[in-house]
């Protein structure tokens, strides 16, 4: 005889009608369905569901062959069909897995209820289709929402790909697979239960954290990028002052050289731009400073192609006289710093200096992400 296991104990039964087709926690009233609240504060109702796959026999296996295949199924069902990997909210309901047969093995049925995890559904159905591939092929899939008296949807699923598509795709997007003709629901007829398992470990169910005002990842990345750039470029005190032999005769000659560099390194990939901009005279701070050449009031603008937001932050307050020679001195030191920092690294993300542009009022530098 063929045995079935039910949460660790063995059972076997054959009853007419729907008694053996287990689906607990059916709820007719929508307001009683489990709910989830998204980050915008909207309450979403998640209906109890039953997924029922029909397999048709290609060549009748012996009872010993069926028993052997069931023994291959058990380990995966035990490890996969549990609440440890099942996200809220359906983990508040009882979930059952069943393998049943009708007409002496002519049809097999895979019954899975109240599991909201696509990963679990995919693993279970995919594994069973693989185990029974030689002797059974998929035929139809029923999806019933809320309760069994509701209108069930029946889909034609004659291949593994079709089964997975129906299991993992929103029903509104698979209307072309729906069987509109007569498809008798199998649960009104008697069936032999070959295997039954109830999901365990409800106390370990996955409950993801949600926040009303959760910052977007690219906003966090912008702040991290800014911190790395400021730390690596503007606050490095180990860079020696520019050598007299490196003097550039005028701002125009520096611009010409920078333009050549920019043409070689211009890129359309996602990048971050840093702008050091003169914003007016402020009285110098007292005492010597090793970083006076790069310490006027700096307004820093960081932008990426994946965000429509820009963040501006004042990072330092010191000034120098507004003169072409002062800008040339800034350009010289910036050029020397570029050679010392060809790459920046912050939290595993690497950046390269793509280009520098100098005018009489500002120096702009483009930092390109190497991870894109």
Curated annotation (Swiss-Prot):
Start-end of Low complexity biased regions: 299-309
Residue segments, region Disordered: 259-326
Name assigned to this protein: Non-structural protein NS2
GN (gene name): NS
């Amino acid at each position: 005889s063929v045995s079935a296991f039910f949460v660790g104990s063995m059972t076997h039964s054959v009853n007419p009608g729907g008694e053996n087709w287990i689906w607990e926690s059916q709820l007719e009233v929508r307001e009683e369905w489990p709910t989830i609240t998204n980050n915008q504060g909207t309450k979403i109702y998640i209906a109890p569901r039953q997924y029922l796959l029909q397999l048709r026999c290609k060549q009748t296996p012996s009872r010993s062959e069926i028993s052997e295949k069931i023994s291959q199924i058990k380990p995966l069902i035990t490890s996969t069909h549990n609440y440890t990997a099942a996200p809220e909210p359906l983990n508040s309901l009882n979930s059952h897995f069943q393998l049943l047969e009708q007409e002496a093995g002519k049809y097999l049925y895979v019954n899975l209820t109240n599991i909201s995890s696509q990963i679990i559904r995919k693993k279970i159905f995919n594994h069973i289709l693989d185990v029974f591939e030689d002797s059974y092929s998929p035929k139809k899939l029923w999806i019933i929402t809320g309760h069994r008296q509701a209108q069930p949807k029946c889909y034609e699923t004659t291949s593994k790909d079709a089964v997975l598509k129906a299991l993992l795709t929103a029903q509104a997007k698979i209307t072309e697979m729906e069987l509109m003709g007569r498809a008798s629901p199998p649960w009104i007829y008697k069936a032999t239960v070959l295997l039954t398992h109830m999901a365990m470990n409800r106390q370990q169910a996955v409950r993801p954290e949600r926040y009303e005002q959760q910052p977007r990842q690219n906003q966090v990345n912008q702040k991290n990028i800014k911190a790395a750039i400021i730390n690596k470029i503007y606050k490095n005190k180990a860079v020696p002052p520019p050598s007299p032999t490196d003097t550039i005769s005028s701002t125009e000659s520096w611009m010409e050289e920078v333009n050549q560099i920019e043409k070689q390194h211009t890129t359309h990939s996602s990048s971050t731009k840093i702008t050091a901009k003169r914003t007016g005279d402020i009285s110098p701070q007292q005492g010597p400073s090793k970083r006076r050449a790069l310490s006027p009031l700096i307004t820093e603008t960081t932008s990426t192609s994946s965000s429509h937001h820009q963040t501006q932050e004042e990072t330092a307050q010191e000034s120098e006289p507004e003169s072409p020679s002062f800008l040339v001195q800034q350009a010289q030191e910036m050029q020397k710093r570029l050679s010392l920092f060809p790459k920046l690294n912050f939290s595993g993300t690497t950046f390269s200096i793509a280009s520098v542009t100098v005018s009489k009022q500002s120096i702009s530098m483009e930092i390109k992400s190497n991870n894109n």
